[in-house]
Amino acid sequence: MNLDNLKKSVNYFIDNYDDVGVSVYAILKNRGDSDPVKIDIESEALNGLKKIFVQSIKECVFDNDDLTVLNLSSSDERLNALYIYDLEIPSELATINTVISTDDLPKLNLNQHDLSSIKALLIELGNDEKQIVLYKTLAQVNIFKRSGLFLKKSKSRLEKIDDEFLRISSGFQMFQVDGALLVVDLQTIEKSFGFHDVIKKEAALGVAAVEKIQLVQNQEVLLELLDDIKYARRFTKIAKSSPVLKSGIPNNEIIQFCQNFPTLTGK
């Protein structure tokens, strides 16, 4: 999926705003690979969520003139990019497909679970024709528990809020549309889902590819670098899309290039 295709996919939800519905699901803590549960939300609040997140999608994709779309396996440090998740997908992220394919997921029982048991939200926007699902982590600062004292305005006075309540802001870390899972917040992904292990696994394939052509004498030196995700990402690029390896360039030409190229000399 390139940027033009992505804009076309996302624009559907903007152009068909009135025909798009919204459902919200929760991924619970300490539930392993269990399916997400649906959160029962009143219609007025759902309409507010739809407005917030359709606008947030628009800002993410359309309001950034320098935006690019890259594969996650070849990610770099550029700021204005969305990353297509082209690596092994963790089980928690696979629940996004569950939301799209299943209409009768169980509801969240608030008598058994408090709001602090929610790890992340899945916001599904769409209709029978097309869906987009947003993945949003839920920080504890957005959950207000009964242990605190919170007041709300009531006519001319303040009254105590007795129940837990949840603040849902705009913004999200990932979204899936038309079968493509895209990462918005790369830092969040790197800290979650065992992402570093996934990158190391893919990067090890890159080291193996270098070893196969006998370009280095000691691959253990390269394997030690994989504990640093910055270097692991670079070897992931080698495994997935190295033009040098794909072209079968002889080792002596590779070495000669490295010896003569200004920024590589002496490395």
Language-model regions: role of each:
Residues 3, 219-222, 231, 250-254:
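Short amphipathic alpha-helical segments that mediate assembly, nucleic-acid/protein binding
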Residues 32-213, 232-267:
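Acidic, low-complexity, intrinsically disordered interaction modules
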Residues 200, 216-225:
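The feature represents the first ordered module of a protein
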Residues 2-53:
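Charged, amphipathic alpha-helical stretches
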